[in-house]
Regions:
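Surface-exposed coil/turn segments at beta-strand junctions on protein surfaces, enriched
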Residues: 46-48, 61, 114, 154, ...
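Residues that define the transmembrane beta-barrel architecture of outer-membrane proteins
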Residues: 49-53, 102-106, 149, 155-159, ...
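C-terminal beta-signal and adjacent terminal beta-strands/loops
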Residues: 76, 178-186, 204-257
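Flexible, surface-exposed loop regions and adjacent strand-edge segments
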Residues: 4, 11-19, 84-94, 137-146, ...
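Membrane-embedded beta-barrel scaffold of Gram-negative outer-membrane proteins
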Residues: 1-6, 10-95, 102-104, 117-121, ...
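Residue-level recognition of strand-loop junctions within catalytic nucleotide-signaling folds
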Residues: 1, 60, 113, 208, ...
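Gram-negative outer-membrane beta-barrel transporters
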Residues: 65-78, 94-187, 254-256
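Outer-membrane beta-barrel proteins
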Residues: 41-45, 58, 94-98, 111, ...
């Protein structure tokens, strides 16, 4: 593939380098075959390939009152595609290739019912270890070796749990929690989002003609980021992040026809 954003940076760099000549009138910027090869190398990225291995089991226990899923995986990736800040100016994003990386982990899930089917519950957990095996960014003295660093944007842990209890045919109470482990935002692992959890709850009223649901999300108003980048376009490294949703509450009404 080709990075449109990076090609824009190449054009901007050449225009700045030749602006004095261009201001005098029409001007053709000369290019050699080596120049075109260098540009192609700069803006192009290779396809990503991977070998994936997975083993797991699905169990129904206690007369289907309890369901248990367990799996383990291993993935070997070559030319892993990474989204990074683009070019000299740091605006926009582009795709680059890391040399090699691997990911391994486990996933487990439990779900079941109690009290004659009135109480539904579920919980899940996932662990992922994703690291670079070979990745050198840049050339010569400016080269940076990321071997052994965690692959960015991959949370190391994910957890979730929920429970719903039907008090009557028309009233249901429920709660849920979702958690995400440490997530690095850059290849060098210099900044990250620490583990956080988001709590939610709902009360459902079920009638023949309509349903009403009162709900709340992020009840503890947890402060967390869903995405972060750094930028050095001004000469000083700055960090920018997208905040996760704060406390929210609302009412949903659904009519049946």
């Amino acid at each position: 593939g080709y990075n449109i954003q990076m090609f824009s940076d190449v054009l901007q760099t050449e225009l700045n380098a030749n602006r004095n000549q261009a201001m005098r009138g029409d001007y053709h910027i000369p290019h050699t075959e080596e120049d075109y090869q260098r540009i192609d190398k700069t803006i192009a990225y290779k396809p990503e390939t991977s070998w994936n291995y997975e083993a797991g089991a699905h169990l129904n226990l206690f007369d289907h009152m309890l369901h248990f899923d367990l799996s383990a995986f291993y993935m070997k990736v070559t030319n892993q595609q990474l989204s990074v800040m683009a070019g000299n100016y740091g605006f926009g994003r582009m795709m680059v290739n890391a040399g090699k990386s691997h990911s391994c982990g486990i996933e487990a899930a439990l779900r079941g019912q109690l009290f004659d089917g009135k109480f539904d519950w579920a919980m899940s957990y996932g662990y992922t270890r994703s690291k670079f095996d070979k990745y050198v960014d840049g050339e010569g003295e400016d080269a940076v070796d990321y071997k052994g660093k965690y692959v960015p944007y991959v949370p190391q842990h994910t957890m979730a749990a929920m429970a719903d209890y039907r008090l009557t045919d028309w009233l249901t109470l429920g709660a849920n929690v979702n958690a995400q482990g440490k997530t690095y935002w850059d290849n060098a692992n210099t900044y990250s989002q620490k583990m956080y959890a988001v709590l939610g709850a709902h009360v459902d009223l079920n009638f023949k003609a309509f349903n009403v649901s009162f709900w709340g999300r992020n009840l503890t108003d947890t402060n967390y980021n869903t995405f972060a980048v750094d930028n050095s376009a001004t000469g000083t490294k700055e960090y920018f992040a997208q905040r996760g949703n704060p406390f929210q509450c609302g009412v949903d009404v659904r009519f049946h026809f």
